[in-house]
From Swiss-Prot:
Residue ranges of the TM segments: 60-80, 104-124, 136-156, 200-220, 229-249, 258-278
Organism name: Caenorhabditis elegans
Superkingdom of the organism of origin: Eukaryota
Top EC category: transferase
One Pfam match: PAP2_C
Active site: 210, 253, 257
Keywords noted in UniProt: Lipid metabolism, Membrane, Sphingolipid metabolism, Transferase, Transmembrane, Transmembrane helix
Location relative to the cell: Membrane
Protein known as: Phosphatidylcholine:ceramide cholinephosphotransferase 2
Topology class, membrane: Multi-pass membrane protein
Length: 335
């Protein structure tokens, strides 16, 4: 028990840290105050603030890695456009279904819809920084690998009417550097979305970047959606696969481009989650730790608790209070 003056001092204290680690628990049934061990100390508060800063820094670093990979893809496209041959390769899908250029816009729209849904889920997830960082990292890995493939093997455009769709190739003249810079800035501003352009750069085929985005966004929805929203997963599946099909039907990609992109992305995504949901002590000895990207990502996951993240939602902003109440009710119904 504690005396009255000590009890009053604790109640009036504004300091969130108690030096002796004791806080007073007031039981509504038993009016006698009972001292219990405080759940965190001054050191814990400092660690929590440091941990929050570290999480933000890691997320920013992951985003910069993604931007570096994406910009490298854009730059390579501006160069290889003038190198790739013009005669398209035979493709079974093109033999069965005539190419439909309107389908490319459908692929862009479905990619955007899937991304908006996935980032909304990330925004509402109570571990949003971890999920966002993982999404950035997975995108950086896939686009980094894609940059390597683009830089070593050049496939001809898959369009049958390539002269109407692809920009003309340019000889390396004195103005070639300015042409490359203009192309690069255009793709940076539009984030690679080309459905609104009359003519586009051609040659970035193996493997499909749109399919990478569609697949990662789809898997994010599968992995981080609360159990009560299982219907969302059934909506995400047709959006994803219709978007992938539209890319091929439009003639914008060979069938092998999207198949390889989906296969690689699925392996990287689920391998990443399998290994980083293990106990920290077991990760370096796991067979998947031999993957080339494991140690690149190890630092990003060093402060994440063992096991799978609990898929709960909360409102990330301080206000309005009504949104916090709504999120609590939604959480209760979705679990």
């Amino acid at each position: 028990m504690t005396n009255s003056s000590e009890f009053t001092d604790v109640l009036q204290s504004r300091d969130p840290c108690v030096s002796n680690g004791i806080v007073i628990n007031i039981d509504p049934i038993d009016p006698e105050p009972t001292p219990i061990r405080k759940e965190f100390t001054c050191e814990d508060t400092f660690h929590h603030e440091h941990h929050g800063n570290s999480e933000g820094f890691k997320t920013l670093t992951a985003f910069l890695c993604l931007m570096l990979s994406a910009f490298l893809n854009f730059f390579l496209l501006t160069v290889i456009h003038d190198v790739v041959p013009r005669q398209p390769l035979p493709d079974l899908t093109f033999m069965i279904i005539p190419q439909q250029r309107w389908a490319w816009s459908v692929g862009d729209v479905l990619s955007t819809v899937s991304s908006v849904v996935a980032f909304t889920i990330i925004f509402l997830h109570h571990q949003r920084w971890i999920v966002l960082r993982r999404t950035f990292l997975l995108g950086a890995i896939m686009y980094g690998l894609r940059a390597v493939i683009l830089g070593v093997t050049f496939l001809p455009p898959s369009f049958h009417n390539r002269d109407e769709i692809c920009q003309p190739q340019v000889n390396r003249t004195a103005m070639y550097g300015m042409e490359i810079a203009t192309r690069f800035l255009t793709y940076v501003i539009t984030l690679g979305l080309t459905s609104g352009q009359d003519k586009i750069l051609c040659g970035d085929l193996m493997f499909s970047g749109h399919t990478v985005v569609l697949t990662i966004m789809y898997f994010v929805q599968l992995q981080y959606t609360p159990r009560g929203l299982v219907i969302l997963r059934y909506i995400a599946a047709p959006i994803t696969f219709l978007g992938i099909a539209a890319l091929v039907v439009s003639g914008g990609h060979y069938t092998m481009d999207v198949l390889i992109a989906y296969w690689l992305t699925s392996h990287v995504f689920w391998s990443y989650h399998q290994i980083f949901e293990m106990r920290k002590d077991d990760r370096p000895q796991a067979p998947l730790s031999r993957l080339w990207w494991f140690w690149l990502c190890y630092w990003f996951e060093s402060d994440v608790a063992d096991g799978k993240l609990v898929n709960k939602w909360n409102w990330p902003l301080e206000g309005p209070q009504r949104m916090h109440t709504i999120m609590n009710r939604i959480n209760y119904k979705l679990q």
